[in-house]
Amino acid sequence: VATIIVTKPAEAGAALADALRAAGATVLFLPAFEIEGAADPVAARGVLAQLAGFDLALFVSPAAVRATRVLLPGNMIWPAGTRIAVVGAGTALAARAALPIASAAAVIAPDGEAAVEALGSEALWAVLRTLQPPPRRVLILRAAQGREWLGERLRENGAEVHTLAVYRRTTRAWTHYADAADIAAALRAGATIVVTSSEAAAVVLDNMVALRAAGAEDWPEPTLIATHPRVAANLRDAGFATVHTLPTLDAQAVLQAGR
């Protein structure tokens, strides 16, 4: 089996890399981003102090949940009128683990297969659009940069939408995490690369271009595994021909797709 390059960041990416190694794979963990705290924590805390003024707090990722918890006072009581919305099962689990102060709040999440994190904004919107009464003041908790699609749908539905950057994604070259020769050897042997966001797809392309330029060599076409059709489309648009879509990043499924 070819080397698997995992670009999913933070704890979830490290956990996937560990699971793949436990299943016998050779893995390079090259996270597309590192997660850092809010650029202006004082300003962020000021917004969070007004949570009671929002009828919906929307978390876009587990990282958003964890970063928000760091910013909230330890003795805070979650406002009873502020519901919580999450994009998938992973974010819902993070909310229950990191926000015990919000245990009494209503948590809105996609059900069934749509609860898979990678299905993201569209799956959550299918639930939010049916809420009665519809949310009127929404706070989206996210990274400094992110997809605007869900906020746009909420505004079209009459909501006043605010976004708060509770964390930052910092990009580092793959060579920050592994030796360039090891990465090039994996690519030369036909690596499988796991990509979990459109932003990560751009990082993968940038790193491959940089490595090719530095080594003055080319490699066979890698196999790409995307977690969302939108990510897969971005990868194909970038020129990658072999792209599989796996909404659930199960280690065995990744191994099978990479064969």
Predicted region positions:
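Conserved beta-alpha
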Residues: 1-259
